[in-house]
């Protein structure tokens, strides 16, 4: 349920860019009746499947242009359990949102019916983060450059985290 997924975090974000990667698609609005803050939605796309790197880099450019400090990336099938997104944002603020850190959630792996890491009420350092649910300080893109579009889909998230780690980003 795309509307339900979006509503799990939309009340706490300033803007949500919805990228349509459908060949022949574009910037048409999706049928999202029931979205809590439709005024926060912006539809983007280019009418062809360009992979997630191009979409992510479009979001980076948008964040820079509009003065945002952080970028949250999500897949269409991602959602937060009730209360989890505000807790995630509070954990980022408590840890230090101004730090050179890429923040990531602890993923629940549906096929294994278990979280990726042991559940704990703390921030742990990990070697890489999946794209969905990750929060990037926008300033890191000045330092590290943008996502590697030529990877298309697979490995974009890991490559960026590894590049960041080589530069001392946690």
Where are these regions (language model features)?
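Acidic donor-diphosphate engagement hotspot in glycosyltransferases and nucleotidyltransferases
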Residues: 56, 83-87, 156
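Glycine-rich, basic loop-to-helix element that forms the pyrophosphate-binding segment
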Residues: 46-63
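Short, well-formed alpha-helical segments that are part of the catalytic scaffolds
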Residues: 1-12
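A conserved acidic beta->alpha catalytic loop
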Residues: 20-31, 48, 78-79
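Short beta-strand-to-loop acidic/aromatic patch adjacent to the donor-nucleotide binding site
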Residues: 68-77
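A short, conserved alpha-helix in the catalytic core of glycosyltransferases
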Residues: 140, 144, 150-170
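Conserved nucleotide-sugar donor-binding
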Residues: 130-145
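Conserved donor NDP-sugar-binding/catalytic core segment of glycosyltransferases
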Residues: 81-116
